[in-house]
Amino acid sequence: MLLLAGLGNPGPQYQNHRHNVGFMAADAIFRRHSFSPWSKKFSALVAEGRVGTEKLLLVKPQTFMNLSGQAVGEAMRFYKLQPSDIIVFYDELDLAPGKVRVKRGSGSGGHNGIKSIDAHCGQDYRRVRIGIGHPGDKARVTPHVLGDFAKADHAWLDPLLDAMAENVDLLITGDESGFMNKASLAVQGKAADIEMAGEKPAQKGRSHIRQARPKAPPAELPSSGPMAAMLKKLFGGKE
């Protein structure tokens, strides 16, 4: 059995927050594959199912983000699982919107839900980091993370969630590169480019550096002297 945990905050007021994209991933997997109805257990919503030959337990902690490890740890111990049997889906500020990266172990990157799981389960589990982008200013991080996805975001978010759900078999069988590739293809050309504030886009085919250079004035040809005589011989001239 593998335990797939999606992180977020419980309650309808949080359901569209960027911080809840882990819940959204779990919901997409639930819809795409055959699972039992959600039930309350381990301070979480849980559903059992199977993808291919692998039995799965979907977990959505209902403890609020900062205590996610309580629910995941309790489920891990109940089913006598190891940290290596756990896959966690969560939001990542330091990835551009629509980017997905899978890694095993390492630090929390400042994510409180991951800190909590590290404390209760150790660090040797796989993390599916789902990019939500950084607002660019530290003071805007909290309202960004705890804000709803914009309507325009669904152009990349919906196909991304669908692709992760459809290809979760690649993830559970260890083909992490294949899973990330499918996720990348799903959002190709759909995630909006983020322009630097106040910077106008370059004209097609010209770099910003090239545009910044002033045009050099045309060279003036000498009208008298030896050089003028030589040029006149080479190119001719009006008499």
Swiss-Prot record:
Q: Which GO terms describe its cellular component?
A: cytoplasm
Q: What is its EC number?
A: 3.1.1.29
Question: Which residues lie within the region annotated Disordered?
Answer: 199-227
- Give the matching Gene3D superfamilies: Peptidyl-tRNA hydrolase (3.40.50.1470)
Where are the compositionally biased (Basic residues) regions? 203-213
Q: Name one GO molecular function term.
A: tRNA binding
Q: Supply the alphabetized keyword list.
A: Cytoplasm, Hydrolase, RNA-binding, tRNA-binding
Any signal peptide, and if so, which residues? none
The record's InterPro entries line, in alphabetical order, gives: Pept_tRNA_hydro (IPR001328), Pept_tRNA_hydro_CS (IPR018171), Pept_tRNA_hydro_sf (IPR036416)
Annotated function: Hydrolyzes ribosome-free peptidyl-tRNAs (with 1 or more amino acids incorporated), which drop off the ribosome during protein synthesis, or as a result of ribosome stalling. Catalyzes the release of premature peptidyl moieties from peptidyl-tRNA molecules trapped in stalled 50S ribosomal subunits, and thus maintains levels of free tRNAs and 50S ribosomes.
User: What is the protein's name according to its record?
Assistant: Peptidyl-tRNA hydrolase
From what organism does this protein derive? Chelativorans sp. (strain BNC1)
